[in-house]
Amino acid sequence: PQGTDAISPAPHHDIYSIEDLHQLVYSLKEATDYQKPIIVKIAAVHNVAAIASGVARSGADIIAIDGFRGGTGAAPTRIRDNVGIPIELALASVDQRLREEGIRGNISIICGGSIRNSTDVVKAIALGADAVYIATAALLALGCHLCRSCHTGNCNWGIATQKPELVKRLNPEIGTQRLINLLQAWEHEITEIMGGMGINSIEALRGNRLMLRGIGLTEKELEILGIKHAGE
């Protein structure tokens, strides 16, 4: 209701099991005449692979994994900065688990949370993502200065606010063009990186961990990521 705090992360009191999730997914598909993809968003946590396995069996079309380094204007800072695991580890473990269970082809994986530049996109695709999504990077393109005051509704740049006097500070046309410039630049950079790898399509990069090497990572981290040390 207006005037009350938003709870983030929001609880889902109608989902306490995979069976509950399956029923919700089925209901949503029925309500949309099976014309819309159903996306289930999960946090990057220590048992994310097991959770994703259940989601894949629920009938959902897409799993969205959110890494702990992602930005949010609603969650308490202690939650935002300390709860969860890096998206790279979560993504790699989910992709591997679904492959081992023979159900990777049944569902798509998208990821976000700390996707800050084109190289992050390349790494995510190589670790098994079908696509990525961005939020903070897009806000920066619009003109966000990372004031970290989204939750107050007093964004000085007119982005995270509903106040008319602040909203008018944001020029939609200029903001749109800046975002287009960002994505076009990333596309160009990704093409260059793939060219350096000798790869000519995103499909050839997807899940291709042979293209990655680890620097300063522990043996366990390398094992989870499914990559080798630099120099190997």
Predicted regions, residues:
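ATP-dependent carboxylate/acyl-activation modules
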Residues: 1-7
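Glycine-rich phosphate/ribose-binding loops and adjacent secondary-structure elements
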Residues: 9-167
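Hydrophobic alpha-helical segments, principally membrane-spanning helices and signal/leader peptides
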Residues: 2, 136, 183-186
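Short, structured coil/loop segments at alpha-helix boundaries
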Residues: 1, 68, 163-164, 174, ...
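C-terminal extensions of enzymes
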Residues: 174-232
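Short capping/connector residues at structural and topological boundaries
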Residues: 1, 12, 17, 155, ...
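Extended, intrinsically disordered, low-complexity segments
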Residues: 13, 157-185, 191
